[in-house]
Amino acid sequence: MAEFVRAQIFGTTFEITSRYSDLQPVGMGAFGLVCSARDQLTNQNVAIKKIMKPFSTPVLAKRTYRELKLLKHLKHENVISLSDIFISPLEDIYFVTELLGTDLHRLLTSRPLEKQFIQYFLYQIMRGLKYVHSAGVVHRDLKPSNILVNENCDLKICDFGLARIQDPQMTGYVSTRYYRAPEIMLTWQKYDVEVDIWSAGCIFAEMLEGKPLFPGKDHVNQFSIITELLGTPPDDVINTIASENTLRFVKSLPKRERQPLKNKFKNADPSAIDLLERMLVFDPKKRITATEALAHEYLTPYHDPTDEPIAEEKFDWSFNDADLPVDTWKIMMYSEILDYHNAEAGMQQMDDQFTGQ
C-alpha cells in the first residue's frame, strides 16, 4: 500500500504518495489545482493536478473519467502525457504529467516572438492536432494557456477535460471566448475538429501580433469584432444557424467586406498570411485541416511527412452518452487506474528483461 503525505497548498490539502516531494503551486487548471513536484523515482520534475471531489456529482465523475481515458489513450510528442495517477485516502484523484516550464500565454505576455519560434510553435500545434483529430477527438478549448512549452521550445497541448467526440450534435458553451470558433457561437450544435483549427488560427495571429486577435467583451461583441476583419459570413453559413434568435441577430448586423489580412499583419510573411487566411474561414468545411496545414509553404522548414504520426486507433467514446450514478463511475475509474498501473508494471518488466536487469 502506498504511503501518503499531506501538504497544504492555497488552503487546499494535497494528499500525495511519498514518491513526490517539493510541492509548489503552479496554478489552476481545468477543474483542479496544479502543483509542480519532484518525482523521486525518476528524479524528474512533474506536474500534479488534483481533481477536487471527483465523485461529488455524476457530471464531475464523468468529466474526470473522460479526462483520464483521454490521457491514457493519447500518446504523442505534442500532447501532454500521463506518468502516474492515484486516488488518495480522501478520494481525490491526482493526475501526474510531465512538467514544462511555461505556457504560450506567459510567453506572449512577456515578449514578442521571433519568426522562427512562431513557425516552430505553430508546426508543433498542428502536428499535435493532426494526431488528436485522427483519434476522433476534438480539443474544444485550445488557447495559449493550455499550450505548454519547455526551455528547448518543445510544445505540448494539455487540458483535455472538455474534449469531446466528433459528434454531429455537439452542444456548446466551451472554449475561452477569444479563441472560440464562430460555429460554436452561432449554431450551438454541429461542430467538429475544425473548431480547433479556428482556435489555432487565433493563437497564430496572437503570436504574430503579440495581442489577442478577437478580444470580445461578450458573445455579441466577439462576433461583431470577427466580422469587422473577416466580413459578413456567407449566406450558406448563415443558413446553418439553428437558433432563431441568433439568426435574427446575425441578419441584423451591417453587411461588411472581408479585410485583407496583410493590412493588419504588416510585418508577416506572405506565406504566414496565406496560411492564416485558410485557418480563419467562416465555413468549417472550407477551413484548412491540420494535415493540410503541415504541408503548407509556411511550415516547410519543419514539415516531415514521415514524422507526423496519426493515432493507431480511434478513441472509444461509447461511455460518453452514458448517464450513470456516481458509484458506477467510481468503479469504472478504479478499473481504469488499475489497468494503467498493470500496463506500466508490464512495460517496466519488459524494459528490465530487455536491459538484462
Swiss-Prot record:
Superkingdom of this protein's organism: Eukaryota
Gene3D superfamilies reported for this sequence: Phosphorylase Kinase, domain 1, Transferase(Phosphotransferase) domain 1
InterPro entries associated with the record: Kinase-like_dom_sf, MAP_kinase, MAP_kinase_CS, MAPK_p38-like, MAPK_Sty1/Hog1, Prot_kinase_dom, Protein_kinase_ATP_BS, Ser/Thr_kinase_AS
Binding-site residues for ATP, renumbered to this chain: V26, G27, M28, G29, A30, F31, G32, L33, V34, K49
GO biological processes: positive regulation of developmental process; stress-activated MAPK cascade
Protein localization: Cytoplasm; Nucleus
Residues of the Protein kinase domain: 20-299
Active site positions, chain numbering: D141
Function, as annotated: Proline-directed serine/threonine-protein kinase involved in a signal transduction pathway that is activated by changes in the osmolarity of the extracellular environment. Controls osmotic regulation of transcription of target genes. Does not seem to be involved in pathogenicity.
Similarity field: Belongs to the protein kinase superfamily. Ser/Thr protein kinase family. MAP kinase subfamily. HOG1 sub-subfamily.
Known partners and oligomeric status: Interacts with the HOG1 pathway downstream tanscription factor MSN2.
Protein name: Mitogen-activated protein kinase HOG1
Organism: Pyricularia oryzae (strain 70-15 / ATCC MYA-4617 / FGSC 8958) (Rice blast fungus)
